[in-house]
């Protein structure tokens, strides 16, 4: 395993650990999710370029589209929760209330 792959994998693991440890605030959870998506994007791009997968060139672009949709929905949820409750605590999210 080269140093590039090791650093990208370490970035993914650090983002995952941050997501598991700092679950109380929605903003920190969203930032950790974005870090995970960024490291997945870089890992996928480096793998495709190193192995010359010509048929998989669109996969990183599709991953970025899903990451942008996830970020937009996460920010929408953050704004709605902070306007309703005044804080961005995850404990304020109760899916049973309509």
Curated annotation (Swiss-Prot):
Gene Ontology molecular function terms on file: NADH dehydrogenase (ubiquinone) activity
Cellular component, GO annotation: mitochondrial inner membrane; respiratory chain complex I
Protein encoded by which gene: MT-ND4L
Keyword field contains Manganese: no
Transmembrane regions: 1-21, 29-49, 61-81
Topology versus the membrane: Multi-pass membrane protein
NAD among keywords: yes
Signal peptide: none
Record-stated family: Belongs to the complex I subunit 4L family.
Main location: mitochondrion
Keywords: Electron transport, Membrane, Mitochondrion, Mitochondrion inner membrane, NAD, Respiratory chain, Translocase, Transmembrane, Transmembrane helix, Transport, Ubiquinone
EC primary class: translocase
Pfam families for the chain: Oxidored_q2
Species the sequence originates in: Pusa hispida
Subcellular localization(s) per the UniProt record: Mitochondrion inner membrane
Enzyme Commission number(s) from the entry: 7.1.1.2
Function: Core subunit of the mitochondrial membrane respiratory chain NADH dehydrogenase (Complex I) which catalyzes electron transfer from NADH through the respiratory chain, using ubiquinone as an electron acceptor. Part of the enzyme membrane arm which is embedded in the lipid bilayer and involved in proton translocation.
Subunit structure and binding partners: Core subunit of respiratory chain NADH dehydrogenase (Complex I) which is composed of 45 different subunits.
Top-rank lineage group of the source organism: Eukaryota
Reaction equations catalysed: a ubiquinone + NADH + 5 H(+)(in) = a ubiquinol + NAD(+) + 4 H(+)(out)
Gene3D superfamilies associated with the record: 1.10.287.3510
Name under which the protein is recorded: NADH-ubiquinone oxidoreductase chain 4L
GO biological process, one term: ATP synthesis coupled electron transport
